[in-house]
């Protein structure tokens, strides 16, 4: 046989051999369920038709397969991206960094925590009815505060989505605000207790009129203390901060102070505009409020507003959010030559984080202070409440301990123990003066919600007495039947054997103060006393604190020893 005659036979044999190999490979792949990647290289290299047919089945435009290089050390599961591994690790550690703290840019979240942001968004959309679209964020470690610049709220939207029904006003509210009570009842009857566009428009006109009246009364100090909404704008929102703001009705609802005499625009709290303060301030974070060193007396009002909905999943008592305003009269003394010679105690306002995912305001006494202060990282104070009285130093404690006024609600979890007083810790220097004026009633809740729990109950008994290191405080409402309409008041405390008692008759027009200074061991150390009174209709509670001169603490100087205060 010649080589030419054997060529067809060899070609046929090669074809049969390659066909047999191809069938064997297909059988192996079908039995094992694996791809050619698991086939020995020696076999694939010797089967050219199989390699060409496999290459024909692959999509040349398909992206390359991701390499899963991130492996979980707990369960050895691999991931292609590091953030996927971090998210998976939370299933082992039970870490939940995403908290439902803000809804639509407002601090009304319920506080629930989630391990993934998509679960948080789904929770807010389902539970809180938040229509905010899901947006992918760069960071997956925590949920930052969403920007409010994209929030658009109008009266039409608020009217179409009622979130809370306004409670009925009680008999005390009828007595205190008869015109307001009648107007509210008519609105509640027509709108079933929900917000409506017409009601909001009426409230807008009322608030604007109230603000104009307030600014007219305080025209002499309006430029520094009560700027209008056109003067200031919220830098976070990028819109005017007042009745013209689209978010104004989310901040000033029915729970705002409804009395024009003490109304104040919310833009008073503009922590983005530090003003020039006196030379004694070193921390710029404390320079957050307008201040004039030449001012004699300034009146600041704190508007307490109620969120539109109680956060889901929270057992919040009606006392938890309040509706009232605190007016702080801050007198300024004639300053001596330097800051070290200033010896005066004033009331300051401090915004603190709240355990209910909402800011709070706390009243504090602090020496050598002429400013309002606010932590640099605090939230907005649109929704505020008085949770607790916090004292900066022993020399500035009040006789009432942590309860500064009947309108101050202090939950048990936030209650702080009263500080210990001694003759050397009594405030010294010139006699200082501070005044707090708080309405006892509310337009929002029935009367059984006030006074707040932990102070004086509706039957006139103190709920929790304060006794600490020689200080005993007892308070009693003398006329239980007319608790708010005509309220009597009595308080007494004992300081190092010195008895002091203040009493007020039922009509609110007589005050008796008994002070027994002869029991003092050191005649130069006179304990402070407080003057408590009510107006005739019982709507307001006031307390004047007087801290006399103390020679024992050594804070008096030659420059201010004989200098009288200036109001």
From Swiss-Prot:
One of its GO terms (cellular component) is heterochromatin. Gene3D superfamilies: Classic Zinc Finger. Keywords: Activator, DNA-binding, Metal-binding, Nucleus, Repeat, Transcription, Transcription regulation, Zinc, Zinc-finger. Residues 12-55, 140-154 have a biased composition (Polar residues). A zinc finger (C2H2-type) spans 70-92, 98-128. Residues 1-67, 123-154 are annotated as: Disordered. GO terms for molecular function: DNA-binding transcription activator activity, RNA polymerase II-specific; DNA-binding transcription factor activity, RNA polymerase II-specific; RNA polymerase II cis-regulatory region sequence-specific DNA binding; zinc ion binding. It comes from the Eukaryota. Residues 123-139 have a biased composition (Basic residues). It is found in: Nucleus. Coiled coil: none annotated. SMART domains: ZnF_C2H2 (SM00355). The keyword Metal-binding applies. GO terms for biological process: induction of conjugation with cellular fusion; positive regulation of induction of conjugation with cellular fusion; positive regulation of transcription by RNA polymerase II; regulation of transcription by RNA polymerase II. Key transcription factor for sexual development. Activates the transcription of ste11. Binds to a stress response element-like (SRE) region in the ste11 promoter. This is Zinc finger protein rst2. It comes from Schizosaccharomyces pombe (strain 972 / ATCC 24843).
